[in-house]
Amino acid sequence: MVLSEGEWQLVLHVWAKVEADIAGHGQDILIRLFKHHPETLEKFDRFKHLKSEAEMKASEDLKKHGVTVLTALGAILKKKGHHEAELKPLAQSHATKHKIPIKYLEFISEAIIHVLHSRHPADFGADAQGAMSKALELFRKDIAAKYKELGYQG
């Protein structure tokens, strides 16, 4: 799967808006993920106790993790598909230590698309959504290949 230069520009344009409030975006994305796919919360020992949206919003740890997730994703997106160096350690930790299934990466991708659309409707129309979906699918496909190399079926 290849994105055109124009598609990458759409992705990176909206990503600049994410980076302007990376903590807020990360928090919103994780809350949406955990609310719509509560099974994903079980992978996070330090968040399992957070049962309500209010508790999630009050959690500094959750906000910090959102920053970590989006910082890593931003570094990958900025490589425009040439993300081997960034992907390798991420795949290693997610396959061997955290055991995060690819399905969960699909779930967080859905949350990312939803949050970006709700926060930036003028900058995240159908073309930008399509480009971001392709970029996230490329990321998932490549991380799934790394998982396979590591012997994790995820």
UniProtKB/Swiss-Prot annotation:
Belongs to the globin family. This is Myoglobin. Coiled coil: none annotated. Monomeric heme protein which primary function is to store oxygen and facilitate its diffusion within muscle tissues. Reversibly binds oxygen through a pentacoordinated heme iron and enables its timely and efficient release as needed during periods of heightened demand. Depending on the oxidative conditions of tissues and cells, and in addition to its ability to bind oxygen, it also has a nitrite reductase activity whereby it regulates the production of bioactive nitric oxide. GO terms for biological process: removal of superoxide radicals. The gene is MB. O2 binds at residue 65. It comes from the Eukaryota. The lineage of its organism: Eukaryota, Metazoa, Chordata, Craniata, Vertebrata. The modification Phosphoserine is found at residue 4. The modification Phosphothreonine is found at residue 68. Heme b binds at residue 94. GO terms for molecular function: heme binding; metal ion binding; nitrite reductase activity; oxygen binding; oxygen carrier activity; peroxidase activity. Its EC number is 1.7.-.-, 1.11.1.-.
